[in-house]
Amino acid sequence: MKRKNFTEVSEFIFLGFSSFGKHQITLFVVFLTVYILTLVANIIIVTIICIDHHLHTPMYFFLSMLASSETVYTLVIVPRMLLSLIFHNQPISLAGCATQMFFFVILATNNCFLLTAMGYDRYVAICRPLRYTVIMSKGLCAQLVCGSFGIGLTMAVLHVTAMFNLPFCGTVVDHFFCDIYPVMKLSCIDTTINEIINYGVSSFVIFVPIGLIFISYVLVISSILQIASAEGRKKTFATCVSHLTVVIVHCGCASIAYLKPKSESSIEKDLVLSVTYTIITPLLNPVVYSLRNKEVKDALCRVVGRNIS
């Protein structure tokens, strides 16, 4: 069968929040504020964990890795979005779009599997406390972090290779960054294979972590219920609630965004979901999981007190 000739597309333009009209300046101020808070909070967490030896444990090692990943994650998406809110119709090259999607997929996948590693850490700490330091060795922690990044890299190569081998007819991306489905819609040809790849990858990235975390917490809850002291049960359970909150928000938004049927898709809902998992969730992590943590707050007080004195 003879291949059709397609006009070569060299750049895209984001439609973004153009439908919000006069509210775009308000959105810019809100998103900029959240962006700055996210960067500051995550940088504070990474810095405190690095310089305070009391926090040199597997749990806080994973926290620092998640905070670092979330920082880069926001840097990949938000600055370009803020630029588009002020200067409309700012183009992005095909290579720039591919690069943004590549790092977005790496970091989003990495975050999911880091949360899984943190769930395993909680399982070992609560269910196998006497062997915790032996099991959660530096070597295993490094392997879990490298494994998370490696899975993210593999998924990104799969996605970007499949996506940018497509011929594109349209140039206007009905979104605020190079997300998978909005870019796929611009293709001139049938994208069934790409949709199958996306569904398979998304299912793996979402359901494998959820499944492993679920198993971990079934075992954790059974151990918590065996604790004799009510105060002990409450304290142990509190350490798990923050992690579960982040997992539910992160994986919940991702599953709705990437696994919902086409018939249920709408531009407004997709924008709200995307804002949640690209802008709100990276701020939620440090607030819920770290800055409310007593050990982190104590470490912050020690660092501030040391600098003042």
UniProtKB/Swiss-Prot annotation:
One of its GO terms (biological process) is regulation of angiogenesis. The chain crosses the membrane at residues 26-46, 55-75, 100-120, 140-160, 197-216, 237-257, 271-291. Disulfide bonds join 97-188. InterPro entries: GPCR_Rhodpsn, GPCR_Rhodpsn_7TM, Olfact_rcpt. It is found in: Cell membrane. Residues 47-54, 121-139, 217-236, 292-309 are cytoplasmic. Glycans are attached at residue 5. Expressed in both the aorta, the coronary artery and umbilical vein endothelial cells (HUVECs) (at protein level). Residues 1-25, 76-99, 161-196, 258-270 are extracellular. It comes from the Eukaryota. One of its GO terms (molecular function) is G protein-coupled receptor activity. PROSITE patterns: G_PROTEIN_RECEP_F1_2. This is Olfactory receptor 10J5. Its main location: membrane. Keywords: Angiogenesis, Cell membrane, Disulfide bond, G-protein coupled receptor, Glycoprotein, Membrane, Myogenesis, Olfaction, Receptor, Sensory transduction, Transducer, Transmembrane, Transmembrane helix. Olfactory receptor. Activated by the synthetic floral odorant, lyral, and by alpha-cedrene, a sesquiterpene constituent of cedarwood oil. Its activation increases intracellular Ca(2+). Acts as a key regulator of myogenesis through its actions on cell migration and adhesion by activating the Ca(2+)-dependent AKT signal transduction pathway. Also acts as a regulator of angiogenesis. Moreover, plays a role in the regulation of lipid accumulation in hepatocytes via the cAMP-PKA pathway. May be involved in sperm chemotaxis and motility. GO terms for cellular component: plasma membrane. It is a multi-pass membrane protein. It holds the Pfam family 7tm_4. Belongs to the G-protein coupled receptor 1 family.
